Amino acid sequence: MDQTAAFHISVLASGSSGNSLYIESEKKKILVDAGLSGKKITSLLQEIGKTPEELDAIFVTHEHRDHIHGVGVLARKYKLDIYANEKTWQAMDPLIGIVPTEQKCHFEMGKVLTF
C-alpha cells in the first residue's frame, strides 16, 4: 500500500437516525452508507462544500435502514455505482428500489477493494 496516499473523511451523520461518511482521495470521492434521505445527504454534502454530482460511488457497509435509506435515490439520480457484498445485496436489493444492474457492484469479504 502506498504510504504517501492521503484522504479526507467527513462524518455527515452518525446515529440511529442515519449514518453516512464522505471519503475523498486524490482520485475518488466515495459516500460510505447513505442512511438518510437523498435530500438530507445532498444538504449535508453541501455543508462541506461538495455535491452528489461529484461522487464516484456509494459503499454500503450493511443493509440496516439507518445505512441505506438514501442509497437507491442517490444512485438513480446521480448514476452512482453501489458497492456491497453479496449478503448485503440480497437483503438490501428489495429495499432500495430499482437500480440498473450495471450500477450494482459486488465485492468479496476479506478481499482488497481498490478505488
What residue spans do the PLM features occupy?
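Conserved beta-strand hairpin/beta-sheet module of binuclear metal-dependent hydrolase folds
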Residues: 1-48
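Structured catalytic core of nucleotide-sugar glycosyltransferases
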Residues: 10-20, 57-67, 93, 110
